Amino acid sequence: MIQSFTRLAVADNSGAKELMCIKVLGGSKRRYASLGDIIVCSVKKALPNGKIKKGQVVKAVVVRTKKEVQRANGSLIRFDENAAVILDNKKEPVGTRIFGPVGREVRYANFMKIVSLAPEVL
């Protein structure tokens, strides 16, 4: 459950380390984002030699949330941190590697490139 001003870790090697959610995309009254949702973020911490710089405004897809997500079969999935993967204008990941597991809901949201790069899909 990601909303405005939520801080997220970055799960790729784009150069950014921490993001802050500015807006949840998908309607003017939409308040929360979950796994597989696209959000607009500001980069709060970044590596000095990375592709993404501090202060940049980027779009990202949520791949891990601390708030549990209920699946269709009744099971719940939750992670230890909130994390996102930074996207370019074509909704492809900016980084070439993904760190940590990603939720299966990312696959249902048609982010196949992220799913194929991820070491584990839960």
From Swiss-Prot:
PROSITE patterns recorded: RIBOSOMAL_L14
Alphabetic keyword roster: Ribonucleoprotein, Ribosomal protein, RNA-binding, rRNA-binding
Similarity annotation: Belongs to the universal ribosomal protein uL14 family.
GO cellular component: cytosolic large ribosomal subunit
Subunit structure, as described in the record: Part of the 50S ribosomal subunit. Forms a cluster with proteins L3 and L19. In the 70S ribosome, L14 and L19 interact and together make contacts with the 16S rRNA in bridges B5 and B8.
Name of the protein in question: Large ribosomal subunit protein uL14
Extent of the signal sequence: none
One Pfam entry name: Ribosomal_L14
GO terms of biological process kind: translation
InterPro entries in alphabetical order: Ribosomal_uL14 (IPR000218), Ribosomal_uL14_bac-type (IPR005745), Ribosomal_uL14_CS (IPR019972), Ribosomal_uL14_sf (IPR036853)
The keyword Ribosomal protein belongs to this UniProt entry's keyword annotation: yes
Highest taxon of the lineage: Bacteria
Function: Binds to 23S rRNA. Forms part of two intersubunit bridges in the 70S ribosome.
Keyword rRNA-binding recorded: yes
Molecular-function annotations in GO: large ribosomal subunit rRNA binding; structural constituent of ribosome
